Curated annotation (Swiss-Prot):
Signal peptide from the UniProt entry: none
Main location: membrane
Classification via InterPro entries: Connexin, Connexin311, Connexin_CCC, Connexin_CS, Connexin_N, Connexin_N_sf
Protein name in UniProt: Gap junction beta-5 protein
GO cellular component terms listed in the entry, alphabetical order: connexin complex
Membrane topology value: Multi-pass membrane protein
Gene label: Gjb5
GO biological process: cell-cell signaling; epididymis development; labyrinthine layer morphogenesis; spongiotrophoblast differentiation; trophoblast giant cell differentiation
Topology, Cytoplasmic side: 1-20, 99-124, 206-271
Location of region: Disordered: 217-237
Subcellular compartments: Cell membrane; Cell junction, Gap junction
Record-stated family: Belongs to the connexin family. Beta-type (group I) subfamily.
GO molecular function, one term: gap junction channel activity
Amino acid sequence: MNWSVFEGLLSGVNKYSTAFGRIWLSLVFVFRVLVYLVTAERVWGDDQKDFDCNTRQPGCTNVCYDEFFPVSHVRLWALQLILVTCPSLLVVMHVAYRKAREKKYQQEVGKGYLYPNPGKKRGGLWWTYVCSLLFKATIDIIFLYLFHAFYPRYTLPSMVKCHSAPCPNTVDCFIAKPSEKNIFIVFMLVTAIVCILLNLVELLYLVIKRCSECAPAKRPPTAHAKNDPNWANPSSKEKDFLSSDLIFLGSDTHPPLLPDRPRAHVKKTIL
């Protein structure tokens, strides 16, 4: 896989991301992809070859390795990074689709705009971006669960005991470079959690921003209303109406006064 081309395509999403999205993209490429390419593959390498058990029984080492390492960390991380970065490419492709439609519209009509700004997060593009955030956060959460299912404590011990057939008895198996591997495991887990938080924060930011844009703005008084003397100087009845505690009874009778309360505290009634 050509990672440089993949990175170049994915970096185009920067133009349509918020500050949280740019931080997420930098975190993914600098702290996850580069660490995976430069160090993780070298640390794991031929992990099965370095898995050693104190027995000469043919097939025992392979069976024990498959029992304790059903899926390699490196393979899981590779699949996780591919799935996590794909939604960002969908956003770029959606923008490219809108620009192509805009260009075709200009060629056919010759004036006007199909989209006010093809790269602006509005309409379907906004939903595509929001769905991409949900998808990325969901993928990271699923892979965190998978790591926990395969390796309950996330970290690797230096020695494991195996008693699976065809091993003659319980044998001790030793994992190569356990401390170094645990450092990278914790690092990748922490960066995944940070990416999840960034996705959720960006999603919350976009929803709040959209709600504030859709909320009706308070209109200022018109010039005609300002020139109206009743608007600047309301009558005494209007002041009394606005400042008093009111009870809407919907009847023609006044409410009875309570004997244990003074008349000054009785609420006024609108007939």
